[in-house]
Amino acid sequence: MKRGEALQAWGRVLAGRLPAMSIEITKECPLRCPGCYAYEDQHLGGPVTLRQLVDRKGSALVEGVLALVDRHRPLHVSIVGGDPLVRFRELEVLLPLLNQRGVFVQVVTSAFRPIPLAWAELSRLNICVSIDGLQPEHDERRKPATYDRILKNIAGHRVIVHCTITGQMMKRAGYLEEFMQFWSPRPEVLKIWMSMFTPQRGQELPECLTPAERQQAIDDLLRLRRLYPKLGMGGRTIREFARPPASPAECLFAQTTQTLSADLKTRITPCQFGGDPDCSRCGCMASMALQAVAHREVAPGITIGKVALISLGVGRTVSRFRPSGIRVAPNAAVIPDRT
């Protein structure tokens, strides 16, 4: 995060607004990926699931998203799903309008269909393509969004490749490096991000990493970032995987991001995973990146996390006098110092 962007985000928080918004713009997805948190029964925190929501299409979707952005004025909007490319016609209208508003947008997709070339001209847009490991495993998990189809559909773009590390991957030595060897040389790849699988509390799925596998993944990433410059993760961010936030109240990402589901009304809490995520096994790269920022000192004994706590408190007070604003989460807690 650049200094100017950080100051803008701080200003939003002090004004009682959240600087980031994540929108599940559709409930539809042609994939059926094992372990997908969006389709967990408790993702929305109640009896209704994502597939049961009434989502929007056409001009109603475009107007609904623009109304949210104009009302809440986030600096950054993540467009997720489902898969956003299910609504690619709406995005062809929406993305240029968001770009004109000065909003930075990230579209997270499986790239199961061609990404319109016109999107490559939008200065405030990132395309993040989800890829689950090497081709044999990925193609089995994410068909029809196979390697061959992805390579064809991202042609002419510079995308971010995002891989979620799973327990299955870490059972084979050298797996992450093989992944880097394939994707790093590709001209279509701008950078590569890695997260780790985040289960719900009590889940023991094949995707879950053991403590030893988690530490091995950290060690591998710290080594690989020196060999592959496209691995766009700093050492501080990678080390945070060893000490994730203890709860959403201690997670700067959760506290500063408003997440809405496909009806554009239902809030997803306590963070983008919804349900009851096991924070002790959190693998969210965005969370780790912001925690790395939170633990930096701005003065002896004063971390950015402490400043953020005070700012969130001020923002909550301010937001009470503006009914139309998004209320900052009332359960914000101190971002713990790390030694």
How would you label these PLM feature ranges?
Residues M1-L18, A249-R267:
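Short, charged low-complexity linear segments at domain edges
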Residues V48-T49, D70, R101, S123-A254, ...:
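Radical SAM enzyme [4Fe-4S]-AdoMet core and its adjacent flexible, acidic
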